[in-house]
């Protein structure tokens, strides 16, 4: 368990609202859908009003994807202005969040197929502008060791505060979690466990340790059943 972290690492909301949070990662790691899942988690579990902001001006339809996720799930998103650069989008988002009474702003940054200097300098610039309370690395648990070395590279550039492991609903998640935590020394905060908007769960080191050791995860199963059926039916 100590390899995975001793305690649950909750989201840091101890900042003057709107609290900025940044999501970084490689392309294909599920960053944009994870942004929407995290927004829904903060709204449902922390009772926060969230604004989502896409800073990905490179991937075709990336901004539209986040806007669409916002519309489908009733989450506030910053209106898109074609051609606006990430630094300018950040400034506009900070003002708009204040005007809209948002408690938290989630910034979905651009990914790349691999780490490059341009990507890292852009993320560093964004970090300097928004001064995030949390910077989450979104990493695909199926990429294992690669994801772990990526985590280390991001940590060397920005103040990485947590990892969100996506596609963590398979057998490989335990090994990926151990290597990510061990190599990067960054706490894992959430697991993406499916496609639905509410398929994001807080990472519990003890439960994952039980899964790795083959002891099953009764607590998670009961919680999942309670969520699906409603607390009363379980009792």
Language model features by range: what are they?
Residues 1-55, 62-86, 90-99, 104-107:
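Primarily NTPase-proximal linker/entry elements flanking Walker-type ATP/GTP-binding cores
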Residues 4-5, 23-24, 41, 69, ...:
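Aromatic-enriched hydrophobic runs in primary sequence
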Residues 29, 57-60, 84-86, 111-115, ...:
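Short, small-residue-enriched loops and turns at beta-alpha junctions
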Residues 53-55, 78-81, 107-110, 138-140, ...:
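Structural motif
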Residues 90-91, 102, 114, 120-127, ...:
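Conserved phosphate-handling catalytic cores of large alpha/beta enzymes
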């Amino acid at each position: 368990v100590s390899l995975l972290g001793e305690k649950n690492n909750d989201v840091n909301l101890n900042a003057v609202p709107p609290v900025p949070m940044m999501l970084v990662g490689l392309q294909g790691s599920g960053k944009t859908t994870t942004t929407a899942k995290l927004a829904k988690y903060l709204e449902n579990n922390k009772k926060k009003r969230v604004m989502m902001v896409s800073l990905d001006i490179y991937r075709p339809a990336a901004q539209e994807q986040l806007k669409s996720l916002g519309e489908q799930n009733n989450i506030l998103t910053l209106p898109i202005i074609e051609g606006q650069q990430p630094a300018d989008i950040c400034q506009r988002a900070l003002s708009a969040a204040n005007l809209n009474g948002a408690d938290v702003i989630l910034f979905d940054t651009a990914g790349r197929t691999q780490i490059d200097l341009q990507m890292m300098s852009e993320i560093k610039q964004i970090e300097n502008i928004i001064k995030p309370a949390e910077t989450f690395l979104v990493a695909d648990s199926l990429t294992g060791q690669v994801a772990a070395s990526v985590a280390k590279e991001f940590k060397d550039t920005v103040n990485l505060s947590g990892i969100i492991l996506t596609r963590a609903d398979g057998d490989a998640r335990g090994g990926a979690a151990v290597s990510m935590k061990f190599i990067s020394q960054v706490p894992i905060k959430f697991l993406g466990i499916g496609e639905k908007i509410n398929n994001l769960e807080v990472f519990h080191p003890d439960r994952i340790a039980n899964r790795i050791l083959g002891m099953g995860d009764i607590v998670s199963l009961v919680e999942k059943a309670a969520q699906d059926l409603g607390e009363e039916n379980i009792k």
